[in-house]
Amino acid sequence: MAGLAVFIHGMWGTPDVWRNWRAFAEGRGWQTMAPALRHHDAPPLEPPPELGTTSLGDYVADLDAQLRALPEKPVVVGHSMGGLIALLLCARGLASAGVLLTPAPPASVIALRPSNLLAFARIVPIRMIIISKITTPRD
């Protein structure tokens, strides 16, 4: 057996986003789990009001408790906000390894650089032209 991998979804995601990754890992001998973050098990168009008051610390505390209950330290795999959560769990020594897929940056890190703005500045006008052509009524 390869070990245990815990897949952590991002904001507005659900554990289902990991179904293909889990199948891939399980096909290679891994045990996997993908817990739902607090208040992320409702349909996306009907989020519970509590979602707006749940903090990153709440998510980390929930997963901290789940990982401490496991018989071994897992590999944590996280995407976006789940990547930041995975990083924080690794920092607490709760994982044997971490895989961070485009993680959200910690609060003290400024991830937006001028080059990012330039890239978006080129894309946005093109999209606006395309959108205006699509949405402009025809006579």
Task: Set out the residue ranges of the language-model regions.
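Active-site signature of alpha/beta-hydrolase-fold catalytic machinery across serine-
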Residues: 20, 88-92
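Active-site loop/oxyanion-hole signature of alpha/beta-hydrolase fold enzymes
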Residues: 39-74
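Conserved alpha/beta-hydrolase
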Residues: 25-47
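Flexible "cap/lid" loop of the alpha/beta hydrolase fold
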Residues: 94-130
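Short beta-strand immediately N-terminal to the catalytic nucleophile in serine-hydrolase-like folds
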Residues: 76-78, 101
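Gly/Ala-rich beta-loop-alpha elbow adjacent to hydrolase catalytic centers
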Residues: 78-82, 86
